[in-house]
């Protein structure tokens, strides 16, 4: 009986591996022809996406993807780490019992709901309040004015970054909290015995010791942000021009696939598969970073 169970479990594992391998192989075989036709360098670094004239360069989409993702991380990492510190080190049990279900609920909300919230609430707020404020009070400041921008209709990098930050917060909070809790109790007690305050203990001892896990949470959140489609499609504006400011519109790579697939054919469809290859490569690199960070975390735990 045990042999049958072990064989069944092995078969399940091999089926998962085979499925992933076949999906990757399918996407690569479907998308590689356009990469070879355009040239890998031109495909990735060119700035023109014009399916009607058979020109397929995705650099504006790559920039849009990473700018929106970077903004979401800038917002979500401090908030997520602060919340994780509160739950793991400071808050009493009654407070934790309220915060944790709220975070789990946040993680369970469908992305289209986040998109609707952004479309109905966030985009009009940016258009009616942030854009006029930036135009009147920030636009004249060197560097900062150019970074923020002074023109916009509410759709763009800022809206996408805020929505993605809200979406990846549960991931960053959960993994960071687990990493903070995994730090040996002896380190906490030793630092307090040496006269450190609780805040000094948290920031000077516990957080550095849990850093690899915190980084893994941030990278996992980054992977979630890069792969998100519906929410960013609804609030980013879907412009294929390189975004030059936070108020500029952008089109992340996932949005391009979702928007254009229904009417794409021929080389256009192949180019969308090629975008999928780039996304796969990015996600695989991020997974490798997470694996290495978790290995370091496990090595620390064994010490």
Task: Give the ranges of each region predicted by the language model.
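Transmembrane alpha-helices
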Residues: 102-105, 109, 113, 172-176, ...
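Interhelical loop and adjacent transmembrane-helix boundary motif
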Residues: 232-280
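Membrane-interfacial helix termini and adjacent extracytoplasmic/periplasmic loops
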Residues: 37-56, 116-166
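N-terminal signal-anchor/first transmembrane alpha helix
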Residues: 1-25
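C-terminal transmembrane helix and the adjacent membrane-cytosol boundary/short C-terminal tail
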Residues: 177-181, 185, 262-303
